[in-house]
Amino acid sequence: DPRGEHAVVSTGAWSTGSMAPLTFLENKDAGAVWAFQVEHNGAWRWEVGNNTVDGYFAVSGPTNINHAWTKKLDPNECFTTVPASFVLASTQQEAIANLTQYRRACRRVDSTTTQPRIIFNDYMNTINGDPTTEKLLPLISGAAEVGCEIFVVDCGWYDDSGDWWPSVGEWLPSKTRFPGSKGIVEVMDAIKDAGMIPGLWLEPEVIGVKSPVAQKLPDSAFFQRNGHRVVEQERYILDLRDGSARKHLDDVIDRLVNDYGIGYFKMDYNVSPGSGTDYQADSVGDGMLEHNRAYLDWIDGIHRRYPHVILENCSSGGMREDYAQTSRFQVQSTSDQQDYRLYPAIAATAPVMVAPEQAASWAYPQSSMNAEQTAFNINTTLLGRFFLSGYINRM
C-alpha cells in the first residue's frame, strides 16, 4: 500500500467467508508473538503498517472506506466499537493455546451443554435435504446402535413442494414427508425412545419470497435499501432490530422446543445481504452492525429461556466462525466439504479458530468404503467434536 500499510478486510455478513478475523504478529528479535482476533459476526478490518512515529497494528469492525459504515453521534452520545482481543506468547503454538484458554474462559453458555456428545446428522452424503419418516427411522436405529447421543434432522423437514429454497420461513413440519396422525412427532419420538436428543436444522434469518410469512410481517422486519426490501437469492433477510421479526423467531423456537422436544438446533445462514440496510440507520453499514448485534442478543435470549438446548453454528459451513458467534454456540461446523480426502487439513487447523471441543468436522463413512477409507474418514472427526453422517444402518 502506498501509505505503508497492509490491510485485510472482510465484507458483508459472512465474517469468515474469505479470511479469518485472526492474525499473528511475530517479533523474532524479541521472541514474542501476538495473536489478535476481531470478535464480530459481520464486517471487519485489520491492518499493520508504519506511520510517522512507529509501526502500528489496528483492528476494527465495519469502516466507512470498506463497509459503507458511518454513525452520527449527538452531543454526549456514546458508541461502543466491536470487541477485539489479543494474547501474547513466545511461539505461535503457545499463542494458539492461550487463545484456546481465553475462549473457554469467556464462553457464554451453560457449561453442562459444552461437554462433547456424539452427533449424527442426516445430511452430508446421505439424505441431502430430502428427509422422510421412511428414510429416517432406519438411520435413527443405526445411529443409536453405534452410540450417537444427538440425532439431527437437517434441511427439508418443512417442505411440501420440492422447491423449498424460496418458500422457507414458517418452519412448520411437512405433512407429506411425515404422514400419519403423528407426523414428524413419530420421528422425534423414535429419536427420544432410542436415547438420543432430537435436533432440527433452521435458517432463521431468512424468509423465502414465496413464504406466507413474507406477507404477514411488515416491511420493517426486513433489510431494506432505498425503500425496498433487499432480495438475495429469492430470500428476504430478517432485520432483528425489529420487534416483529424477533417475535416471529422466538415463537418458532418456543414451538419447536415445547411441541416437539427439540434439544439441538443447527443454525444455518446461506446468503449474505451485501453491505446492510439503510432503514432507520445512519448508513447501510450502521444498519448491518446493529442487526448483527441484535442477532447475538436473540441467541442469548434462547440460552436464557432454554439453557439445556445445544446450538450449532453452521452458517453455510463455517462462514461465520468468529468469536462473537462461537462464544455463544456450543458446536461449530467447520466446513461443508464433501470429499473425505480433503477434510483433514480443515479439521487439523480448526482449533486455531475455535476451542477443539467445539470443532465439528464431518465423518461420513459408507458401506462401499474399504477399511482404510473408513478409518481415514472417521479419524477426521476425532480431532474435534464427533460429527457423524452416512448410511451407517447399511454397514
Residue spans of the language-model regions?
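Short, flexible loop/turn elements at secondary-structure junctions
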Residues: 40, 77, 124, 157, ...
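Active-site neighborhood of glycoside hydrolase catalytic domains
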Residues: 175-183, 193, 215-375, 383-385, ...
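Aromatic-lined carbohydrate-binding/catalytic grooves of carbohydrate-active enzymes
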Residues: 113-251, 264, 274, 281
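Hydrophobic anchor at the start of a short beta-strand
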Residues: 82, 198, 311
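N-terminal accessory beta-strand-rich subdomains and adjacent acidic, glycine-rich linkers
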Residues: 1-103, 108
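Short, glycine-/Ser/Thr-/acidic-enriched flexible segments
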Residues: 41, 86, 125, 205, ...
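Generic detector of well-ordered alpha-helical packing
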Residues: 83, 123, 153-155, 267-269, ...
